[in-house]
């Protein structure tokens, strides 16, 4: 079974993104078996960085899944694509 906790879409633009630094965070804490999936709607030179040093590039139709308590952050895009669109899904999988 699957229990959806939250689904949200994020859209960021490349206007002044070189000034934005996003902090590492977890989506939810203390949720057993909690997972986060990020679906990248479009390709750009941004992505998602993890506190453990891993980096996932924003590439169209890519889905990355990781434990909900793993610290991560948005890496803003600076290329000519005007927007970065992702869909975040937080859920519990038994």
Task: Report each predicted region and the residues it spans.
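Fe(II)/2-oxoglutarate oxygenase catalytic core
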Residues: 1-63, 69, 74-86, 90-94
């Amino acid at each position: 079974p699957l229990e959806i906790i939250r689904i949200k879409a994020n859209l960021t633009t490349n206007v002044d993104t070189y000034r934005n630094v996003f902090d590492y965070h977890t989506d939810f804490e203390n949720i057993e078996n909690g997972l986060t999936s990020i679906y990248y709607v479009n390709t750009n030179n941004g992505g998602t960085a993890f506190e453990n040093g891993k980096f996932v590039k924003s590439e169209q139709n890519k889905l990355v899944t990781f434990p909900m308590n793993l610290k991560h952050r948005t890496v803003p895009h600076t290329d000519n694509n005007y927007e970065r669109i992702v869909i975040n899904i937080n859920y519990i999988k038994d």
